[in-house]
Structures are given as structure tokens and as C-alpha cells.
Swiss-Prot record:
<dbReference type="GO" id="GO:0006897">
    <property type="term" value="P:endocytosis"/>
</dbReference>
<dbReference type="InterPro" id="IPR008290">
    <property type="entry name" value="PI3K_Vps34"/>
</dbReference>
<dbReference type="InterPro" id="IPR002420">
    <property type="entry name" value="PI3K-type_C2_dom"/>
</dbReference>
<dbReference type="GO" id="GO:0000425">
    <property type="term" value="P:pexophagy"/>
</dbReference>
<feature type="domain" description="PI3K/PI4K catalytic">
    <location>
        <begin position="531"/>
        <end position="797"/>
    </location>
</feature>
<feature type="domain" description="C2 PI3K-type">
    <location>
        <begin position="14"/>
        <end position="175"/>
    </location>
</feature>
<dbReference type="Pfam" id="PF00454">
    <property type="entry name" value="PI3_PI4_kinase"/>
</dbReference>
<dbReference type="InterPro" id="IPR042236">
    <property type="entry name" value="PI3K_accessory_sf"/>
</dbReference>
<keyword id="KW-0067">ATP-binding</keyword>
<keyword id="KW-0418">Kinase</keyword>
<feature type="region of interest" description="Catalytic loop">
    <location>
        <begin position="666"/>
        <end position="674"/>
    </location>
</feature>
<dbReference type="InterPro" id="IPR035892">
    <property type="entry name" value="C2_domain_sf"/>
</dbReference>
<keyword id="KW-0547">Nucleotide-binding</keyword>
<dbReference type="GO" id="GO:0016303">
    <property type="term" value="F:1-phosphatidylinositol-3-kinase activity"/>
</dbReference>
<dbReference type="GO" id="GO:0005768">
    <property type="term" value="C:endosome"/>
</dbReference>
<dbReference type="GO" id="GO:0016020">
    <property type="term" value="C:membrane"/>
</dbReference>
<dbReference type="Pfam" id="PF00613">
    <property type="entry name" value="PI3Ka"/>
</dbReference>
Amino acid sequence: MTGNEFRFFLSCDISVPVTFRVERLEGNLPLPKSPDLENNAPTDNRTTELFVECALYIDGAPFGLPMRTRLESLGPSYCWNELITLTTKYRDLTAQSQLTFTVWDLSHGEGLIGGATILLFNNKKQLKTGKQKLRLWAGKEADGTFPTSTPGKVPRHERGELERLEKLVNKYERGQIQRVDWLDRLTFKTMERIKERESLKNGSSHMYLVVDFCSFEHRVVFQESGANFLFPSPIASTNDIVVVWDPEVGKINPSEHKQLKLARSLTRGVIDRDLKPSSNERKSIQRILKYPPTRTLSGDERQLLWKFRFSLMSEKRALTKFLRCVEWSDVQEAKQALELMGKWEMIDVCDALELLSPVFESEEVRAYAVSVLERADDEELQCYLLQLVQALRFERSAKSRLSHFLIQCALRNIELASFLRWYVAVELYDPAYAKRFYCTYEILEENMMKIAAGVNGEEDGFKQWQSLVRQTELTAQLCSITREVSNVRGNTQKKIEKLRQLLSGLLSELTYFDEPIRSPLAPGVLITGIVPSESSIFKSALHPLRLTFRAANGGTCKIIFKKGDDIRQDQLVVQMVSLMDRLLKLENLDLHLTPYKVLATGQDEGMLEFIPSRSLAQILSENRSIISYLQKFHPDDHGPFGITATCLETFIKSCAGYSVITYILGIGDRHLDNLLLRNDGGLFHVDFGFILGRDPKPFPPPMKLCKEMVEAMGGAESQYYTRFKSYCCEAYHILRKSSNLILNLFYLMAGSNIPDIASDPEKGILKLQEKFRLDLDDEASIHFFQDLINESVSALFPQMVETIHRWAQYWR
């Protein structure tokens, strides 16, 4: 490249994600004051745990979810050296795009160290590259508005020799300065001495965050996507259409913006009170109210709802849509919206869950949502408890109205207390939110300890809490047992012998507990010990334990304990199966589902309820058909296919229920080993490692309906198969009516660490939304689902995959 050439890339042509590296923190942290020390003398032996929260702002508005580095506690030179990749691509940036960096400390007080903001493009509209040294504003969270109140750029009059040298280093790294090895080594040594001298001169009054922006072969110059600077000159002699670039395309129209502000002004409120929508406007409003919660409203739709806000106050479905129309940065508009919210028709619990999503940041709106949840009974709350705990991530503080509500519910119901404690305890492994969840855990413990003994012989709070703590002690011992049996060389039988040997010898205290323990899976059941002779190990790579516990009421309960497997995804899926079972039964449709209990007790451990059953693969290998197997347990010479009508009906209904549910949730990796059958004919699914459309197998059918299941119904031409299709369509129709509830629950899980959601929350929720086919009316959706069933039955490729899977199981 000659001196007169300037080669560059256009930002609109770069389709790679925005990437940068958070390197280190320079300078001394402000020392916390300790009330235990005289004159608040500083303490040097403190352990500080820092992480950096990074967020992208475009034109002063947040864009995408913030990203966080890992915790770093190897101070005082805090070095993360962590690569951060945003979902936004360079082509999507504007000239006023900014990155905000906020440093948090999880070990002291509120934990805010400081923040800084940096523009991604300089004043020449060139993308900044290389190392950037940002000054942190102590005690301030990074401000992403434009212009920002926390600029990371050091003022010109304070820049020393080091600033000039750092710019030269950036040029050196881009290859713009010739490399001379022996001279470079001397130069860098000299620079280190200058750096030490500058640090001593500046003292410890400032902190700096060093970040390294991605570098390209050439400079990157900003250009809006879609802009075309190269257009042909309009020549009179040509008949071609001339394309002219309009620089104002896509920008805010000042006239329209002014009209919008006037339309929403307070003086319009007097007129708007008496406005009634016309016939066409009413149809448009009804169409908007049917939108799923994931759909973004257009400007015209927002304006329409705002215009008729007073006439919509009697329509409870309209509140969540109306609150999405509010410009919350406008103080007067926000105030008016909150006043209307208080007078609005009370919304349903389903809509209240939507108001707890990250879209709604107003504390008043979130408090209103909690007030609606207070009307729900404990049984309904338990259906949503997992998501309500996840919603704590989106609160502004640890001591929020939602946190207080969950704790109050737990204090009056020991089962809710047990599940709340476990859900919160699992989130303590998330470094970004550990402090918040630990605060909730502490408040729950503190309040439960204060409960006095009941007049009906109920335990006091201390004993109740201790019974929950013993659950953790039990799981710790089960983890130890799992490690012991995994280390045993040999086949599964030798591992089973080792398990029973441990329970009868070294860990014999587990066979009879000193005091009964509440079952983690069913806190209403007290367990008193493990029965060694009835305990076993599954033939699997992780060697899950199958344990039989004695119950205080004289019976037994069987559980599966897994170590080394993240079952939080299974927990979510089974929770949704349980919820859908409840929704179907409310419409008088019992499909004999088996929503067995699942509880994650850690990031890689958990418990599952054991349901006596056999896999279809095992049944078909021993009995050749499902009907032959069921004839052993429910023979009836006068019944259909030689079995009782009740047994066949249970099989047909359960097949229909799980066919619909696994389709909606996009359950993948289905094979005959994770389809189980109870002796009464009830079929159910296990192992949900792939959800929301993910599947390791090529060409998966829309739903898992193998030919053996259809043959058990008498074939595709039988009346029983027709009944099966009828149940499927009825169940699909019922669940479509509750699509908003299901979508809201998944939306609240967007911040969780569940693998198939965390990888791309937005894509996963859109996949779920697609399965409901909300673009179709009821009749069209029934025809769609009937075609879907026919497509799944005719799928041949999955049958080949089943054969391959059986070969793999043989060699395990």
C-alpha cells in the first residue's frame, strides 16, 4: 500500500459478531470501611471477587442481553483476559454505538466498583481497534445513554507519555510499524519503566480497565446497512431507472416524532377519555390482543393502543400490550400509565407472569404483577415456582417485592419452602447472580427460624429448617456413594454388590435415619431410611442409583439419584408436562400422563421419581408386540385385541398426550429406550436432553409415533387409531388456548443456564411459538395437526435409527 492509498472495509459488510477481550483492572480498589476496626482502618487481608458486566447500547438504548466475565479473585492485579462475543454483528452498529463496562464486587456491600463507557467509532467514523484504557467512574454504574455521563476516555490534559506510547503499540500490533526484534525488546523494557513512573506520579486516585478490541487487516469505516454511495449519474440519454441514495432513510422523521409527542401529551388525555374505536379500529385492536407475548408491536399498533387506552381499561387482556406501548423514559407518560394500571380490570395470573419478564423494568409494574400472584393458591404457585425463582434475576435488587412474596408463601407451606430452598440453592452456582440468590436464601432461613410451634403439634421453624438441611446432607452422602461404586471395576452386578455392601456396612446409618427426613421430591412424605436389598444401579455410563426408601407411614418410595448429569432441563420439561396435564384436566380431558417428579440438587446432580415400567425396546424384544405384553397383565377374551378396554384406552390416551406435548416442546433424541410403558398401559417419555427442536439424529419426524404403537391400536385404519387422532387434536386445541402461559413461562427461563435455552433464548422461544401455529384459526389448526400425524406415521428413516441405537446398547 502506497502512502496515498487508504484501504478500508465498510462496517455494513462485516457479518461477524462484535468481539473484544476484557484484559485487566489497573489501580487500587477503594478499601471498604469496617465497623470492627478503630478509625475505620483499612484491612489488607480481604478477599475481593470481581466480575465485569459488558453491555451494548445503540443510540442510547440497550441492545441485546448484557454479558459477564467470570469471577476474578487473584488481586490486586485483577486479570480476566476473557474473550467476550456479543450476538450483535458489526453490520448492525450505528455511529453512536457504545459499550458499557461495569465492575462489580461480590464480596462487599452493594458490590459496585465503577463503570465506564466507550464509543465504538471515533470522530472520523472509524472503528476503534486494539487496546483501550478506560477510566472507571468510582461508585457509578456505566451509563449507556448518549451522551454518556461515564466516559471512559481520559481527558486530554491528563494524558501522559504513556498514552502516546499505547497508540504506537496499537499501530505496531496492526503491522503499521516495522518490526526490529532487538530494538523492539529494548523499547518495551523502556516502556515498562515509563509505565511504573506514570503510576507512581498518578498515585492510586484512579482505576482503569484495559480492554482489547478486535483488529482487522484494514481500517473499518462506518456506513449504514443498505446505503449505496455508488450510483450512476442521471444522464438524459438513458432510459434506465437511476438509483439515488437517500441519507435520511431509516432515520426518525422530525415531523412524525413531534406529532407522536403531541398525540401523547397530557392535554390529549381529556379528549382521549371519550374516544371509542371504530369498527375497523376495533378489529385491529382485537388482532393485536391475540398476538403472542414474544411479538414486538409496530409504531402504529403502539399508537392505536395508546389512543384508546381509556376505553380498553375494561379489557384485562389489553393491559400487558398497553404497558408495552408506554415510553417509560417520559416521566409524565409513565406516571399516567401507572395511574391507569391501578384502575384497569384485574388481569389473570398468566398475564402477571409476562409482567415479570425482563421486558418490564418498572418496579411498580412488577409489584402489580406480584399483587396478582397473591390471589393464586399454593397448588397453582407450585406450578410456576421454578420460573418465579428465575424471575428474581430481572429484579432491581435482592430484597424485591417478588422475593418477599415467595418467602411468605414458603413460610405458610413447608412443601413450597422445600422446593424454593432447592431452586435457590442451585442458582448459587451462577457467579453473576450468586449474591442475589444467597440473600434470598438467608432471608428464608432467618424468617423460618422465627416460626413458633403450632397449637396442633406442628413443628417450630427451627425443626422445619433442620429437616430441610438434612436433605442436603443426604444428597451429599449419595454423591459419595455414586463415586465409590463408579470406581469399582467390573460389570453392573459388581457395582450393585458394592452399593449394598456400603449401605449395610460403612454407611449403615443411611438404612435407619436418626430422625425422619422430608423427601426432596415430595416434601409431604417423611422417609426413615434406605432398604439395601431393594436398591440397585442402572446399566448406564453414569451409574445412576435406584434407591428404595422406607416411608414413615409404612410404605416405600423409590427414587433415582444421578451424579454427573445436569438434569435441570429434565426438571423443566417434566414441570411443563405436569402443567399441561393440569390444563387438560381442567377441560375434562384426562390423558393418563405420568408427570413423574424431578429435582435438580446441583449443577450436575439430582433426583428423579422411579416409576415401575419397561422400555418399548425391551418389551418388543421379548414379546414382539405391545399387545402381547399387555395381555399378560390385563387379559380379556371379550375385550379388544384380547386385553381389557380400560387398558387399551389408557394406552391410546397416553400416546396421544405425549405425542402432542413432545411435538410442542420440540423434544428430540426419541428412541424406543426412552419410551416407557407401565403395566396398566400408560406410556410416558424420559430423558429430555434435547428440546426446542434440537435433535442429534438426522431427519427427525415431527412427533415420535412408531409403527409398533400404531399396530397396538389396530393399525392406521382401525377405529382406535381414529380415536387416538381425535384425542391428539382435542389436546392440541386445548393447549393452544394456553399458549401465552406456556410462552411466558419459557420466557422467564431465558436467563437460566439450561443448555438448550441458554445457547439462544430468543430462537428457542420462537421455535416454541411456531409449534402453536397461532396464525391459524381453530379449524385450520386441527387439519394441520391431522396432517402432522400422518406425516410422522409414514416416516421411515427413524426406524433405521432405532436399529442403530439397539446395536449401541448391546455393546454398552
